From Swiss-Prot:
Protein name: Lipoprotein signal peptidase
Membrane topology of this protein: Multi-pass membrane protein
Organism: Wolinella succinogenes (strain ATCC 29543 / DSM 1740 / CCUG 13145 / JCM 31913 / LMG 7466 / NCTC 11488 / FDC 602W) (Vibrio succinogenes)
EC number: 3.4.23.36
Chief location category: membrane
Keyword Endoplasmic reticulum belongs to the record: no
Record-annotated active site: 110, 127
Protein's GO biological process: proteolysis
Amino acid sequence: MRIALFRSLGLFVLVFAIDQAIKALILGGFRWESEALSITLAFNKGVAFSMFAFLEGWLKYIQLGMLGGILLFLAYDRSFFVAHYLPLSILLAAGFSNILDRFIHGGVVDYVYWHYGFEFAIFNFADVMIDVAVALFLWQTFFKQK
């Protein structure tokens, strides 16, 4: 349990710090353009594809409550945490980083804009890490030998 907790905290800090450092660069004015991809600043007031933007200021508290619920569950079921600390650490770090954006900037700082062939939603490193965490969790659940 202690090793999992130590690794989890380290990974949490790493993912959180990388995401916030990239966002600081973007907020500082860094931009980049190409035919397929642009790095540009956008504030997402909703969640994926700007859904639930109508919740405005309440969304950050709802998300904070959801992450708090996950933490309470993990405190209750420590074996689940030990089995899945890797994706959980990534998920929580990315989630808390995006929630911090909502408190500080009024919306999530997004910056990666894919526009080759079709226009895709703008996203950030934390969003990618959430996808990675879900993929890892699914792999551990369905394919990892027990």
